[in-house]
């Protein structure tokens, strides 16, 4: 398993990080399993595990962040 850090997600809260909508989207669309959420002031990070190579996930990181932002806007 590879650990992936999805960083700098504005507006992310622990409630959104734990939401079934976000969990389902990341697991079904990107094969990412959320392992945790880290918030230190301005930094918001989702920690995920995956069997997919990190270099491949990084190619889709912009799309992943856009999808997460769409969920944040939908929840708030």
How would you label these PLM feature ranges?
Residues 1-4, 74-76:
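Short, Lys/Arg-enriched, disordered terminal segments
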Residues 4-7, 12, 39, 51, ...:
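Exposed, low-complexity/repetitive linear segments and helix-based recognition motifs
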Residues 22, 26-60:
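Acidic, low-complexity, intrinsically disordered interaction modules
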Residues 9, 35-37, 75:
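Generic beta-strand hydrophobic packing signal
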Residues 2, 35-37, 67:
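Polar/charged side chains located within well-ordered beta-strands of beta-rich proteins
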Residues 19, 53-76:
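Ampiphathic alpha-helical segments that act as solvent-exposed interaction surfaces
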Residues 2-30:
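N-terminal acidic leader/helix
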């Amino acid at each position: 398993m590879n650990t992936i850090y999805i960083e700098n997600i504005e507006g992310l809260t622990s409630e959104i990080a734990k939401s079934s909508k976000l969990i389902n989207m990341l697991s079904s669309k990107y094969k990412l399993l959320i392992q945790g959420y880290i918030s230190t002031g301005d930094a918001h990070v989702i920690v995920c595990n995956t069997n997919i190579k990190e270099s491949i996930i990084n190619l889709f990181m912009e799309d992943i962040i856009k999808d997460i932002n769409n969920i944040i806007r939908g929840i708030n």
